[in-house]
Amino acid sequence: MDDSSINKELKQKLNFSYCEEESESEGQEAWETRDAHSQIPDRAEGQESEAKFTPPGPPLSSVHEVGTFQEKTKKSPEQVLMTPVSGFRNYPETPAQPDSRSKLLDCESPFTPKGLLSQSVISSTEKIPSRGSKHLRFTPVPFVDEMTSSALVNINPFTPESYRKQFLKSNGKRKTRGDFEEAGPGEGNVEQGLPAKRCVLQETNMASRYEKEFLEVEKIGVGEFGTVYKCIKRLDGCVYAIKRSTKPFAGLSNENLALHEVYAHAVLGHHPHVVRYYSAWAEDDHMIIQNEYCNGGSLQTAISENTKSGNHFQEPKLKDILLQISLGLKYIHSSGMVHLDIKPSNIFICHKMQSDSPVVPEEIENEADWFLSANVMYKIGDLGHVTSISKPKVEEGDSRFLANEILQEDYQHLPKADIFALGLTIAVAAGAESLPTNGAAWHHIREGKLPDIPQKLSEEFYNLLKNMIHPDPRERPSAAALARSRVLRPSLGKAEELQQQLNLEKFKTATLERELREAQQAWFSQEERGDAGVSGTPTGSRSTKRLVGGKSAKSSSFTWGKSSP
């Protein structure tokens, strides 16, 4: 019986129909190799007959056996044939069984068991690293997720440039990963890839924070962009003003507009003449801002009540309002921002709550802490139109208080636009009629003419208001100048006069001390010259004897006086 017939019968038993031609050739090569190494050719026929009835080998029990066997088959056919297998001890010269196993592992036959096929794919590849902590730590996929999530962080446009660069600068601690090392040069573009993202404003499926944390008391205001509610926080029991945007976020531009006020509040921080900001979040596609509650309402409400009763704010109160709002504007302008919507409805009043403990007199005598003792505080609120002085993106406010240069899109003197609006606000608080929104009367005011005020104001105060609405913004006083104006702070003028007198007295004292030192130096120098002249005379030897003798005489009088007769 030849080799080909034996090989065909073995293939029929294994039902190996997909790789017949390949198995024939390989089987024949294996027999030729085996015959070359055999030392007893006489037994070949008997062994061939026994190979006809060789049963299939036992199934592989583990992935380890498959991988081990495959590694052996990959070395060389000779090594595979010469390796003794425990399942073939009775048939040491049977080549078909290991060859069939290699076919099961290497050929994707329709009759190949799926388990063996999948195991062969695994074993044919390189060693898979363990999914331990080290593998997870250095895989780039989670790091890509971190970079993606960091792109969802909003960049506050009002943050100072130096602080923003420091904030965006990487500290290099995460640069152990290869992908991040390659992406290192693009770190400077982080800011460009961090716009206001819509997902930053969206809440996940969770209970309403507004309903969970706050108890709504009443509605206290309605504006163009939102409604304000008086609420009590359930946790601390304090009262807050919660502002909810009227319109939902329909697009990215509306989101930026809604975030504008949050950005401004966050950068400004806390100031006694700016409404305090606590937190903000998005809920049901609406922006919600938690602010300080001002128990006195708005200045517009107070003006309306005065108009109904026929009263007006008197000049001392008007000066107080102007001074406090000027201090708030000074702080905003010094932070590199402008409000651009100063008007009575955006100025809020806080009445000081009476304390059970008496106020220590020393605490209110300091001029620098005068606002701590004020019974009424005036604060600037509604920062929805705030923009940067250096990079303005102007959103026009109320046209009744709008400066002409803003209408002409001249943004070179933006802080002076707030001064213009503040001057008209004080005029309205003084009793002026409702301001025009357009027309000849509107332009009449922009020419530097105050509206009619029913009460008599002092000349200096009236002129100050006129300067605040001067047609040329450069001629208007700054917020810092208003804060130190003697018209608004007479006591500050007296203090300055006293300070000047003190400085003059200090100068006089310093002059006298200098003259005294010069006189002392002249006297000492004269004494030194006198001593030098006496020691330099021609009869120096005689004078020396006399001086010595004189000294000796004096000493003898003290020493020998008692013993002399």
Curated annotation (Swiss-Prot):
Q: Is ATP-binding found in the keyword set?
A: yes
Q: Which gene codes for it?
A: WEE2
**Primary localization class, coarse:** nucleus
| Keywords on record | ATP-binding, Coiled coil, Kinase, Magnesium, Meiosis, Metal-binding, Nucleotide-binding, Nucleus, Phosphoprotein, Transferase, Tyrosine-protein kinase
Q: What protein does this entry describe? A: Wee1-like protein kinase 2
Can you tell me which residues bind ATP? I220, G221, V222, G223, E224, F225, G226, T227, V228, K243
Q: Where is the composition biased (Acidic residues)?
A: 19-29
Please give the function described in this protein's UniProt entry.
Oocyte-specific protein tyrosine kinase that phosphorylates and inhibits CDK1 and acts as a key regulator of meiosis during both prophase I and metaphase II. Required to maintain meiotic arrest in oocytes during the germinal vesicle (GV) stage, a long period of quiescence at dictyate prophase I, by phosphorylating CDK1 at 'Tyr-15', leading to inhibit CDK1 activity and prevent meiotic reentry. Also required for metaphase II exit during egg activation by phosphorylating CDK1 at 'Tyr-15', to ensure exit from meiosis in oocytes and promote pronuclear formation.
Annotated source species: Ailuropoda melanoleuca
EC number(s) for this protein? 2.7.10.2
List all Basic and acidic residues biased stretches: 31-51
Gene3D superfamilies per the UniProt record, alphabetical:
Phosphorylase Kinase, domain 1 (3.30.200.20), Transferase(Phosphotransferase) domain 1 (1.10.510.10)
Q: InterPro entries from the entry?
A: CC_SR_Kinase (IPR050339), Kinase-like_dom_sf (IPR011009), Prot_kinase_dom (IPR000719), Protein_kinase_ATP_BS (IPR017441), Ser/Thr_kinase_AS (IPR008271), Wee1-like_protein_kinase (IPR017164)
Q: Region Disordered: what ranges?
A: 18-78, 169-191, 521-565
Residues annotated as coiled-coil are 495-521
Modification(s) after translation: Phosphorylation leads to increase its activity.
Q: Where does Mg(2+) bind?
A: N346, D382
Listed GO MF terms: ATP binding; magnesium ion binding; non-membrane spanning protein tyrosine kinase activity
Cite the SUPFAM superfamilies for this sequence: Protein kinase-like (PK-like)
Q: Which GO terms describe its cellular component?
A: cytoplasm; nucleus
Short motif (Nuclear localization signal): ranges:
173-175
Motif mapping: Nuclear export signal: 317-331
Would you say which domain of life the source belongs to?
A: Eukaryota
Q: Which reaction does it catalyse?
A: L-tyrosyl-[protein] + ATP = O-phospho-L-tyrosyl-[protein] + ADP + H(+)
Query: Flavoprotein as a keyword?
Result: no
Location within or outside the cell: Nucleus
